[in-house]
Amino acid sequence: CSGFWYFDCDENSEIVNANWSHEFRKMLGYHDTLDFPNKLESWSDLLHPQDKERVMVQLQAAIKDKTNQIKYQVEYRMRMKDNQYQWFRASAEVIRRLDGSASRIAGIFINIDAEKKEIMQAQKSAAFHRAFTKADLCEYYVNLEANTFDTFKVEPSLMTVFEQSHTWDE
């Protein structure tokens, strides 16, 4: 899923108007301008607290860069209408006046939640594997007669502890 958005900027490159497409609102679980108004805060207030500053700094850097060398391409989490967070990727281009000031920034918004969760699960599995092998929390069984090799035998109670431990956001 993807949605379109744009911001109009004044002569000082300050955002004065925001516009969100119907698809953009729908991806977040909203319906129209009544429950998701065309305001910057409608979007920025839903950014995950750990992502908000980074996202806003990147947006301002892209808007203020009169050379267009700084691109707005960022991944972040947003709170959906159901209060769950999902991952999104935003990419935009800045349209400039002759003096280089931003006139409009227009972009696309893509839901990458499934992709991010798949990557995080792979990282989690790799981390568990490293923890098991480096901490000798597993056993290796080689049966030469049957030509078999079993790599893990972790106590169920220990596996539960590892599965319940979280060292990063999911």
What are these regions (language model features)?
Residues 1-43, 127-170:
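PAS-family sensory domain signal
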Residues 31-106, 116, 120-124, 160-170:
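PAS-family sensory domains
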Residues 113:
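Acyl-donor (CoA/ACP) binding surface of acyl/acetyltransferases
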